[in-house]
């Protein structure tokens, strides 16, 4: 399955929507947008090709569902019709878009050197990222949006599965409610796990629908964590970061796990240099 076949398959599956399609051959993306207000989503086709090799039609079904929900909620009147507003935080990579296609700034809070916090209007089966143009319709300020979201994330259940690998304990939060990675913002939940840890506590948000917490009790645990995060990162529909974070008392410190049984914490100079290089690269695009 190649990029063109994926493009055609998606167009066929989404033909029932009142949308238009714009294919960018150079970027290998497909933009799907409403015919009434031109709002839409852009799909990176090359990423789907890689996932299709493993997941087959399942990944196509996921993309179609995501697009259908997103397009439906991009109706300009949808916000005004809402009676029960639910705001939630979502985690995204620092490379994620800072503005909408229309140029409106997303409401963003810095989280770590690898992640930012965005804020979303929960729509039941999906959500819509909040930008500055939506604040008036919501009747909220930026600060209110941020406070409401943190309050709401603490109300979610924190169910998880555990697994022991070569003496190390791993916790997996994977409820598929759209906010699994967001639970990294629930410090009480993390602190409760921290109290149970006998070794170093690491956390990771490789993609939107999983939070991995590890109690690293021996050197092998670092290698296992690196393998897990990379595997989740490559399979996620909305990937975030393949790096892990050391956690203690509400503080996150990104770490590299180098080679076999080694790790290296990232100092501020390294972080600043990486961020500067990333900005220069983005400016050249």
UniProtKB/Swiss-Prot annotation:
It comes from Staphylococcus haemolyticus (strain JCSC1435). Pfam families: DUF1444. Belongs to the UPF0354 family. NCBIfam families: PRK13668.1. This is UPF0354 protein SH1179.
């Amino acid at each position: 399955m190649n990029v063109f076949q994926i493009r055609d398959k998606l167009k066929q599956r989404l033909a029932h929507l009142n949308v238009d399609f714009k294919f960018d051959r150079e970027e290998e993306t497909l933009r799907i947008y409403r015919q009434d207000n031109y709002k839409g989503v852009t799909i990176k086709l090359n990423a789907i090709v890689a996932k299709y090799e493993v997941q087959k039609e399942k990944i196509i079904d996921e993309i179609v569902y995501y697009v259908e929900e997103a397009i439906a909620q991009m109706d300009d009147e949808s916000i005004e019709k809402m009676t029960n507003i639910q705001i939630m935080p979502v985690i995204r990579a620092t490379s994620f878009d800072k503005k909408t296609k229309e140029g409106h700034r997303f409401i963003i809070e810095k989280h770590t050197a690898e992640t930012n916090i965005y804020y979303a209007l929960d729509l039941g089966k999906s959500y819509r990222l909040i930008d500055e143009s939506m604040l008036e319709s919501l009747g909220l300020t930026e600060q209110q949006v941020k406070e409401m979201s943190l309050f709401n994330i603490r109300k979610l259940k924190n169910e998880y599965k555990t697994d022991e690998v070569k003496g190390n304990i791993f916790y997996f939060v994977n409820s598929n409610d759209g906010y699994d990675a967001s639970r990294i913002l629930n410090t009480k939940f993390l602190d409760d796990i921290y109290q149970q840890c006998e070794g170093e506590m690491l956390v990771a948000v490789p993609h939107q629908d999983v939070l991995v917490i590890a109690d690293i009790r021996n050197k092998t645990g670092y290698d296992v964590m690196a393998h897990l995060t990379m595997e989740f990162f490559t399979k996620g529909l909305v990937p975030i970061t393949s790096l892990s974070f050391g956690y203690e008392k509400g503080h996150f410190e990104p770490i590299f796990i180098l080679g076999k049984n080694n790790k290296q914490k990232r100092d501020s100079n390294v972080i600043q240099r990486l961020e500067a290089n990333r900005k220069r690269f983005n400016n050249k695009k």
